[in-house]
């Protein structure tokens, strides 16, 4: 049996832009994607700390060092620039893998610059 486990998150990031006219997804600074080991087009959950909204989408790469967290498409109705969010990724793991999994927690500052990596 495989289990779906939390494996990484970008914690308390600030939404920098919202674009209703974009097809969909969330644009994330590539430095943060790398730190969290989230791939382009990987499914992510976004939990809005500011207003409680939650959604599923997929990750797109933003310019390195830009701090961009861009909410695109219909999701822009749920999240606005300035909102604080958690972006989380999950994966399927065997029982053995799940028991030793050490999720990555990427902490950022107010400008979405990497502060540190912490174990979950």
Swiss-Prot record:
<feature type="active site" description="Proton donor">
    <location>
        <position position="58"/>
    </location>
</feature>
<comment type="similarity">
    <text>Belongs to the PanD family.</text>
</comment>
<keyword id="KW-0456">Lyase</keyword>
<protein>
    <recommendedName>
        <fullName>Aspartate 1-decarboxylase</fullName>
        <ecNumber>4.1.1.11</ecNumber>
    </recommendedName>
</protein>
<dbReference type="Pfam" id="PF02261">
    <property type="entry name" value="Asp_decarbox"/>
</dbReference>
<dbReference type="GO" id="GO:0004068">
    <property type="term" value="F:aspartate 1-decarboxylase activity"/>
</dbReference>
<keyword id="KW-0566">Pantothenate biosynthesis</keyword>
<keyword id="KW-0865">Zymogen</keyword>
<keyword id="KW-0210">Decarboxylase</keyword>
<dbReference type="InterPro" id="IPR009010">
    <property type="entry name" value="Asp_de-COase-like_dom_sf"/>
</dbReference>
<comment type="pathway">
    <text>Cofactor biosynthesis; (R)-pantothenate biosynthesis; beta-alanine from L-aspartate: step 1/1.</text>
</comment>
<dbReference type="GO" id="GO:0005829">
    <property type="term" value="C:cytosol"/>
</dbReference>
<comment type="subunit">
    <text>Heterooctamer of four alpha and four beta subunits.</text>
</comment>
<keyword id="KW-0068">Autocatalytic cleavage</keyword>
<feature type="active site" description="Schiff-base intermediate with substrate; via pyruvic acid">
    <location>
        <position position="25"/>
    </location>
</feature>
<dbReference type="GO" id="GO:0006523">
    <property type="term" value="P:alanine biosynthetic process"/>
</dbReference>
<keyword id="KW-0963">Cytoplasm</keyword>
<keyword id="KW-0670">Pyruvate</keyword>
<feature type="binding site">
    <location>
        <position position="57"/>
    </location>
    <ligand>
        <name>substrate</name>
    </ligand>
</feature>
<feature type="modified residue" description="Pyruvic acid (Ser)">
    <location>
        <position position="25"/>
    </location>
</feature>
<dbReference type="GO" id="GO:0015940">
    <property type="term" value="P:pantothenate biosynthetic process"/>
</dbReference>
<dbReference type="InterPro" id="IPR003190">
    <property type="entry name" value="Asp_decarbox"/>
</dbReference>
<comment type="function">
    <text>Catalyzes the pyruvoyl-dependent decarboxylation of aspartate to produce beta-alanine.</text>
</comment>
<keyword id="KW-0704">Schiff base</keyword>
<feature type="binding site">
    <location>
        <begin position="73"/>
        <end position="75"/>
    </location>
    <ligand>
        <name>substrate</name>
    </ligand>
</feature>
């Amino acid at each position: 049996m495989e289990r779906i486990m939390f494996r990484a998150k970008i914690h308390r990031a600030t939404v920098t832009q919202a674009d209703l006219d974009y097809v969909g997804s969330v644009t994330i600074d590539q430095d943060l994607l790398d730190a969290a080991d989230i791939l382009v087009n990987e499914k992510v959950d976004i939990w809005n700390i500011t207003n409680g909204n939650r959604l599923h989408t997929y990750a797109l790469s933003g310019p390195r060092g830009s701090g961009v967290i861009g909410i695109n498409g219909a999701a822009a109705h749920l999240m606005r620039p300035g909102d604080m969010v958690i972006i989380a990724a999950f994966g399927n793991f065997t029982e053995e893998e799940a028991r030793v999994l050490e999720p990555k927690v990427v902490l950022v500052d107010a400008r979405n610059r990497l502060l540190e990596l912490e174990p979950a």
